[in-house]
Amino acid sequence: MSIDFRNIIKPYPSPIITGRGIDLDFPMLAGCLALLGLGLVMITSASSEVAAVQSGNTLYMMIRHLVYLVIGLGACIVTMMIPIATWQRLGWLMLIGAFGLLIMVILPGIGREVNGSMRWIGFGAFNVQPSEIAKVFVVIYLAGYLVRRQKEVRESWMGFFKPFIVLLPMAGLLLMEPDFGATVVMMGAAAAMLFLGGVGLFRFTLMVVLAVAAVTVLVQAQPYRMARLITFTDPWSDQFGSGYQLTQALIAFGRGEWLGVGLGNSVQKQFYLPEAHTDFVFSVLAEELGVVGSLCTVALFVFVCVRGMYIGMWAEKAKQYFAAYVAYGLSFLWIGQFLINIGVNVGLLPTKGLTLPFLSYGGSSLVICCACLGLLLRIEWESRTHLGSEEMEFSESDFAEEPTHGR
């Protein structure tokens, strides 16, 4: 008796196994895999000196990153197997889970302090960063809200303000860690989703003005944030003090010139540039691969983010509005984090502790990025094969024989 293993591992139709084989958005997948591969190479180079001192093995950080990468690819596959309708039904539970994680991380004895911030929950040798999970859960919840309350959001102030009953307490928990960067990224993505959801221009403008005012107050409320802002305007005035990290990052860009000094030949990673393998991995990349390599990396990021937005548009055309909002929201998270990290590295923004998606060393960020990729691939597949995300009963006949639009 033969056993069809596809029926064991595939409770629902999925882009992994279909009647035509693997049916994925290969341009999106290729772009993200290219970034992941580049990230692995740069982590191997940028972390070698730190790893040698901390563990005696120059490949220690690379091995850990590779483990996170394998876990992340597994998370990507799992999210591709789950129907988008399931995420929509679980929106409230995810929101509660996000609040629970953010509360846990600030509790003494549970949260783990690193560099003066309580942003991690320790599980043995590994740390989990709840803010990375919370940002995605907020996107999923808000996408469901925009679908349920579409008319209310577009026509009334109450529909506009209701999401902030959830968003503001969550932002407060993030600021208690403190994690100002994650707060800005999350609130920025939420604001963009509300705008796409049909919030009037006047209400959106008011929201932006209030957000700018809030950021101004938050910067002035904490001396270290104010110091970073002052240093950012002229880092060379205190290049061995508060401006040290930024000046070393700029030196890395200067050393790289057009074609770079070559892979593995960075000088700045040798304890001159702090966090060379995490927040400032792009500076090491610029030093080793030069302006040309940096621009190619930026082009890859632009392609991936634009492709994510197009996936949202395709879902919207297929009238799968929840999936469309999720795709938009995830893309905005990537765009926000990418712009802030690159801006910090090149000196256009004050120093902020945000990783570069797909490239920086960090298990939580890498796994969540891969899971988001899985969601986007699932959304693209469902919109292309016209699998409904509301009341669909799955069967083998749901597999489309031909794509309904070319991409």
From Swiss-Prot:
The keyword Cell division applies. Pathway: Cell wall biogenesis; peptidoglycan biosynthesis. It is found in: Cell inner membrane. Residues 47-65, 111-119, 177-181, 225-283, 343-355 are periplasmic. GO terms for biological process: cell wall organization; FtsZ-dependent cytokinesis; peptidoglycan biosynthetic process; regulation of cell shape. It holds the Pfam family FTSW_RODA_SPOVE. Belongs to the SEDS family. FtsW subfamily. Keywords: Cell cycle, Cell division, Cell inner membrane, Cell membrane, Cell shape, Cell wall biogenesis/degradation, Glycosyltransferase, Membrane, Peptidoglycan synthesis, Transferase, Transmembrane, Transmembrane helix. It is a multi-pass membrane protein. GO terms for cellular component: cell division site; plasma membrane. HAMAP family: PGT_FtsW_proteobact. InterPro entries: Cell_cycle_FtsW-rel_CS (IPR018365), FtsW (IPR013437), FtsW/RodA (IPR001182). It comes from Pseudomonas fluorescens (strain SBW25). GO terms for molecular function: lipid-linked peptidoglycan transporter activity; peptidoglycan glycosyltransferase activity. It catalyses: [GlcNAc-(1->4)-Mur2Ac(oyl-L-Ala-gamma-D-Glu-L-Lys-D-Ala-D-Ala)](n)-di-trans,octa-cis-undecaprenyl diphosphate + beta-D-GlcNAc-(1->4)-Mur2Ac(oyl-L-Ala-gamma-D-Glu-L-Lys-D-Ala-D-Ala)-di-trans,octa-cis-undecaprenyl diphosphate = [GlcNAc-(1->4)-Mur2Ac(oyl-L-Ala-gamma-D-Glu-L-Lys-D-Ala-D-Ala)](n+1)-di-trans,octa-cis-undecaprenyl diphosphate + di-trans,octa-cis-undecaprenyl diphosphate + H(+). Peptidoglycan polymerase that is essential for cell division. NCBIfam families: ftsW. Residues 1-25, 87-89, 141-155, 203, 305-321, 377-407 are cytoplasmic. This is Probable peptidoglycan glycosyltransferase FtsW. The chain crosses the membrane at residues 26-46, 66-86, 90-110, 120-140, 156-176, 182-202, 204-224, 284-304, 322-342, 356-376. Its EC number is 2.4.99.28.
